[in-house]
From Swiss-Prot:
Pfam family, one: SCGB3A
Tissues/organs with expression: Highly expressed in lung and trachea. Detected throughout the airway epithelium in lung, with slightly higher expression in large airways. Found in lung submucosal gland acinus where it localizes to serous-like cells. Probably expressed in club cells of the bronchioles. Not detected in other tissues tested.
Protein name: Secretoglobin family 3A member 2
Alphabetical UniProt keywords: Disulfide bond, Secreted, Signal
Species lineage: Eukaryota, Metazoa, Chordata, Craniata, Vertebrata
Family, as annotated: Belongs to the secretoglobin family. UGRP subfamily.
Signal peptide residues on this chain, from the entry's feature table: 1-21
Job of this protein: Secreted cytokine-like protein. Binds to the scavenger receptor MARCO. Can also bind to pathogens including the Gram-positive bacterium L.monocytogenes, the Gram-negative bacterium P.aeruginosa, and yeast. Strongly inhibits phospholipase A2 (PLA2G1B) activity. Seems to have anti-inflammatory effects in respiratory epithelium. Also has anti-fibrotic activity in lung. May play a role in fetal lung development and maturation. Promotes branching morphogenesis during early stages of lung development.
Amino acid sequence: MKLVTIFLLVTISLCSYSATAFLINKVPLPVDKLAPLPLDNILPFMDPLKLLLKTLGISVEHLVEGLRKCVNELGPEASEAVKKLLEALSHLV
């Protein structure tokens, strides 16, 4: 049950992170050229996934290690979804 809760929270965080990245890249070109914003410097500190995991007291390294163990025990359909999640989390380590 805890694993399902963590999986759902991580999935929601990844979706919100993707939505944030999508919206930031939609700045119109003339505005972007007139007033360049230092968003690249701010966003690493405001990473919602890292913030959520840190708030829950979960280390990313332990989560990645646990997901790798889960991938070895799952069936082919479920393992593909967990592999994608593991790939996304491994960028945070």
